[in-house]
Amino acid sequence: EDIRWPVGGEIDILENRGRISNISSSALHFGKQWNKKSTLVGEALIPREVRFQDKFHSISLVWKENYIAFYLDNSLDPYFTINSDHPEFQKYKYPFNRDYYMILNVAVGGKYDDYWVDFDAFCSDRACSNKENPDSHRFIIDWIEYERL
């Protein structure tokens, strides 16, 4: 099936900004072409006293016909839900009722976050390098589980 982006839609299960450690987000992208599209974002707010990066977390995606929900860890309440009745799907067709491929894009940085660059966050000394201790600064995916309901 030759469906181009963003017509076919994109589901981002997890997106984070390194400089904002108390927000984890998920996003849906869809539309007619790259400059005529919508992006819907849901954010899970983590209390500031909790260091989100100090332990593994589970991001769950419940994906049913005309409905998508995202959950953080063991919460019974989703932090982001969308269904095909959302007003943005009046402008652009709801594309999420079809099969998808899973792609793990584990990029860090880039032009996400409104092109904002925190130059103070660049690693320029041994204190922020992980050369001597690779475990100190990594993005680790422990496991992925797929279950068809």
Predicted regions and their residues:
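GH16 jelly-roll
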Residues: 1-149
